[in-house]
């Protein structure tokens, strides 16, 4: 990362339901694989902390696991979190807020809930399939406001 001025995100605890099949396995010392990977991410990024207090080595931490989000923020206090799973996968804004510190430190990803917003109960009566872009925009604004309320307020 340092040599090329780039960043990287490492899969730590992903949002998919089957993530636990591997990431929740216990090591001999009793820690889980995701905890060990988090410790590695933290150590790899120690010497790569930038101007805003975060490392260029980031971690993917799923919104669908709020207990782990909080735990992983403690293990990786200077790591940017890429947080998938908000919306269609069931991740909630109040859970995602646990991955932020002072309103920063995370990038929230939502895909299906934006791409298919025109089909959702919230927007299907207002936007047609041809207006999917408008529905996507409306949902993105709604999500932004919901996240800001939990993260910043």
Name these PLM-found stretches.
Residues 30, 34, 65, 89, ...:
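Generic structural signal for well-ordered, non-membrane alpha-helical segments
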Residues 2-6, 27-31, 78-81, 100-103, ...:
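Short, low-complexity, polar/charged sequence segments that are solvent-exposed and flexible
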Residues 34, 38, 42, 69, ...:
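Generic structural signal for well-ordered alpha-helices
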Residues 10-21, 109-121, 143-146:
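A short, terminal or domain-edge coil/loop segment
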Residues 1-58:
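Conserved anion-binding
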Residues 1-2, 42-46, 70-76, 144, ...:
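Surface-exposed amphipathic alpha-helices with a cationic face
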Residues 96-105, 116-153:
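C-terminal helical cap(s) of enzyme catalytic domains, especially alpha/beta-barrels
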Residues 59, 63-109, 113-120:
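A C-terminal functional module that forms or caps the active site or interfaces directly
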